[in-house]
Amino acid sequence: MVLDLDLFRVDKGGDPALIRETQEKRFKDPGLVDQLVKADSEWRRCRFRADNLNKLKNLCSKTIGEKMKKKEPVGEDESIPEDVLNFDDLTADTLAALKVSQIKKVRLLVDEAIQKCDGERVKLEAERFENLREIGNLLHPSVPISNDEDADNKVERIWGDCTVRKKYSHVDLVVMVDGFEGEKGAVVAGSRGYFLKGVLVFLEQALIQYALRTLGSRGYTPIYTPFFMRKEVMQEVAQLSQFDEELYKVIGKGSEKSDDSSYDEKYLIATSEQPIAALHRDEWLRPEDLPIKYAGFSTCFRQEVGSHGRDTRGIFRVHQFEKIEQFVYSSPHDNKSWEMFDEMITTAEEFYQSLGIPYHIVNIVSGSLNHAASKKLDLEAWFPGSGAFRELVSCSNCTDYQARRLRIRYGQTKKMMDKVEFVHMLNATMCATTRTICAILENYQTEKGIVVPEKLREFMPPGLQELIPFVKPAPIDQEPSKKQKKQHEGSKKKAKEVTLENQLQNMEVTEA
């Protein structure tokens, strides 16, 4: 995931000042741009010198061949005149005046200079890339410039009644319908581990079927992705911070051969966006085939580092969940990807409108965007039991930022194009099932149970097509109030004092 290097090169029409400004708007280090420009300038100088040295080496070989053909004496003198050691000014005429033995010596020295130059070039290329991969995509003009998403995310529109309040939160409701085992899940899988069971399994499957059917009717191809990716491929679709904060690493045998003891490093996917992004890696996509639209379906795995203490109960923020994802490869021309961006968020909105979930759409501030996103809109549903908006959907246009690293090019072949172009890539959540279940539970709760949204009823089993009944009391109703806790603790303290007094009296009687 990187920007076009030509954007940093003034002689190629680039504007480093524009990228520096983008970094500042993202509240990231603009000095990375200057470091990259310096490393790139030195790299280009080094490559130019290496090209000239290779030409000189070929000239040496050609001159030796001509002299051998003429049967000129090889000579034994390997001393090199001072002016010949200046390779930048060395010409064919200068070489022709030397003996074969001297030219061979010159070729050997040129070889050493090439190796030294190549070593320097590799070092500069690595330095340049380290800076390049930490510089974010160019921002869309409509992105709010701020580093405080809590205060400055811009609300674009609201749908439904986002003021209504209801009694229970999703944390209680998953227990009341007997669809969740949290304590046992944590014993088996660790923190945030859970078992989804009974009615909520049916509700989850109903959401998956409905989401896939909706996307299928809009020209999306359903695709079930691998759950893990090779390290070298994951590096092309994920930014560096994700490896520490989000991704799980798995290590296994590198081969199915019993005598092979090598081990392979892979990463569990955090979203189906990652493997789908790599699906057309190293390909040329024809203009007439675009847009290519995928409805990704996968289990997702996230470490949630940095979320300590947030949403620790229930199923809203968990390490493992199912998700349906919109993913699109688009033309880079005629504003096509931005038209697709609007279409994808509209598709998500219509999905949640059909489920009757109130929401608002927020334009995410520049400081909270990941490197790849040029712009991101979130759909945040209203949770009437929690009294808060919670994120269900993220929709991003990454323009050509991801495609460049994955080498997914636009057009026929390089020979038929004046300049290599890259497709634009977009992604948007359709339905993260556990979060959507939480939103349904809070919005559709009644005194007797959860009313099943009309669009999901055909996917539910008999007896659960209209109402999911409450079968357990709410945990919050089982917890004593602060006043009750205080009274209980006071009674226990008083009882202890009485017991101690009785013991002292008994001791006095015994002694008497």
From Swiss-Prot:
Annotated segments matching region Interaction with tRNA: 9-61
Regions of compositional bias (Polar residues) in chain numbering: 500-512
CDD domains: SerRS_core (cd00770)
BP term (GO), one: selenocysteine incorporation
Modified residues (N-acetylmethionine): 1
Reaction(s) this enzyme catalyzes, per UniProt: tRNA(Ser) + L-serine + ATP = L-seryl-tRNA(Ser) + AMP + diphosphate + H(+); tRNA(Sec) + L-serine + ATP = L-seryl-tRNA(Sec) + AMP + diphosphate + H(+)
Binding site for L-serine: 271, 302, 325, 427
Region ranges (Disordered): 472-512
Pathway annotation from the record: Aminoacyl-tRNA biosynthesis; selenocysteinyl-tRNA(Sec) biosynthesis; L-seryl-tRNA(Sec) from L-serine and tRNA(Sec): step 1/1
Domain of life: Eukaryota
UniProt remark on domains: Consists of two distinct domains, a catalytic core and a N-terminal extension that is involved in tRNA binding.
NCBIfam families: serS
Protein name: Serine--tRNA ligase, cytoplasmic
Species name: Rattus norvegicus
Gene designation: Sars1
